[in-house]
């Protein structure tokens, strides 16, 4: 099945979405968005699903491994609107929310926004994943 949806990435945990897949997705997005040698600001948060803390910590490790000049703002447990607010407030380059929104508890995923908390569309997600 396809985990790439219109404005997010989600699937059943741990079969379709897991720590390894989250790291691969984040790696592709950072490669696409990062400007060499400039500070890169990322806001990251997660919802209260049981699988979210593990995915959140895997994502943070992946970010720290790839980006040297980074300002990482950890929202910890948060709502998606709060993460979007923080992304805009801190003028972040990217916001990452670990959530599967309204989907059943066995699902999890990511919502990723760019500058000004602008959501990244499904077409853009696929382009980044195919090039990243």
What are these regions (language model features)?
Residues 1-15:
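N-terminal amphipathic/basic leader segments beginning at the initiator methionine
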Residues 11-32, 41-132:
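Gly/Ser-rich phosphate-binding catalytic loop and adjacent alpha/beta segment
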């Amino acid at each position: 099945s396809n985990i790439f949806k219109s404005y997010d990435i989600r699937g059943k945990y741990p079969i379709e979405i897991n720590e390894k897949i989250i790291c691969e997705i984040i790696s592709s997005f950072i490669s696409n968005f990062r400007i060499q040698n400039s500070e890169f600001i990322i806001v990251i948060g997660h919802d209260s699903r049981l699988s979210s803390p593990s995915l959140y910590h895997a994502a943070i490790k992946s970010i720290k491994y790839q980006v040297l000049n980074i300002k990482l703002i950890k929202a910890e447990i948060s709502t998606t609107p709060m993460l979007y607010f923080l992304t805009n407030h801190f003028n972040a380059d990217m916001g990452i929310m670990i959530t599967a929104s309204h989907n059943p508890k066995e699902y999890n995923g990511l919502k990723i926004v760019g500058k000004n908390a602008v959501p990244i569309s499904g077409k853009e997600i696929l382009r980044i994943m195919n090039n990243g």
